[in-house]
Swiss-Prot record:
GO terms for molecular function: acetylcholine receptor inhibitor activity; ion channel regulator activity; toxin activity. This is Frontoxin V. Pfam families: Toxin_cobra-type. Produces peripheral paralysis by blocking neuromuscular transmission at the postsynaptic site. Binds to the muscular nicotinic acetylcholine receptor (nAChR). Keywords: Acetylcholine receptor inhibiting toxin, Disulfide bond, Ion channel impairing toxin, Neurotoxin, Postsynaptic neurotoxin, Secreted, Toxin. CDD domains: TFP_snake_toxin. Belongs to the three-finger toxin family. Ancestral subfamily. It is found in: Secreted. Expressed by the venom gland. Disulfide bonds join C3-C24, C6-C11, C17-C41, C45-C57, C58-C63. It comes from Micrurus frontalis.
Length: 64
């Protein structure tokens, strides 16, 4: 599985997930400088945090 790994709205960077990490993850939240985005491979989909504006977990290549 490959997942996007950049912190921007459009993403050209992806990585091959390590063994056991078969979920692509994207989390968004707001900071003083605007919206922040985190993307990576994970083993389990995390809970939506109190400051998160959205959370996406998926198993299709580069779906995050």
């Amino acid at each position: 599985l490959t997942c996007n790994t950049c912190a921007f709205k459009t993403c050209a960077n992806s990585e091959t997930c390590a063994a056991g990490k078969n979920i692509c993850y994207q989390r968004k939240w707001n900071e003083h400088h605007g919206e922040r985005i985190e993307r990576k491979c994970v083993a389990n989909c995390p809970e939506l945090g109190s400051h998160d504006t959205s959370l996406l977990c998926c198993r299709i290549p580069d779906c995050n």
